[in-house]
């Protein structure tokens, strides 16, 4: 039986990304605090799906992933040419970590 986990996760990612895009097409500065927190939550959820899709796809293609972490997966995905720019992904990891571990309204607005 063919492993379709990466395809199922990719479909979930596409749905999550569409919801994030919908939110980002609005004027973020007009959002109330709860709405802003919802957008950040959508970003975090979408990013989690994104790096896990990369991991699942690379494993499906036979790549050996020694370390299962977002940074390790992104670096391998870049080396294996699954993504064109690791820096953008690494910044997203930093943004996600910043929002997960701190609360600073200025940083919140910047992300």
What are these regions (language model features)?
Residues 1-111:
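Solvent-exposed interaction patches of small proteins and small membrane subunits
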């Amino acid at each position: 039986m063919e492993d379709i986990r990466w395809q199922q996760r990719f479909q979930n990612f596409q749905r999550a990304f569409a919801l994030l895009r919908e939110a980002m097409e609005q004027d973020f500065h007009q959002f109330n605090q709860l709405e802003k927190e919802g957008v950040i939550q959508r970003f975090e959820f979408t990013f989690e799906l994104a790096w896990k899709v990369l991991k699942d796809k690379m494993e499906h293609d036979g790549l050996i992933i020694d370390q299962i972490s977002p940074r390790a997966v992104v670096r391998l995905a870049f080396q294996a040419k699954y993504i064109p720019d690791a820096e953008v992904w690494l910044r997203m990891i930093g943004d996600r970590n910043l929002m997960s571990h701190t609360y600073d309204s200025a940083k919140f607005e910047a992300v």
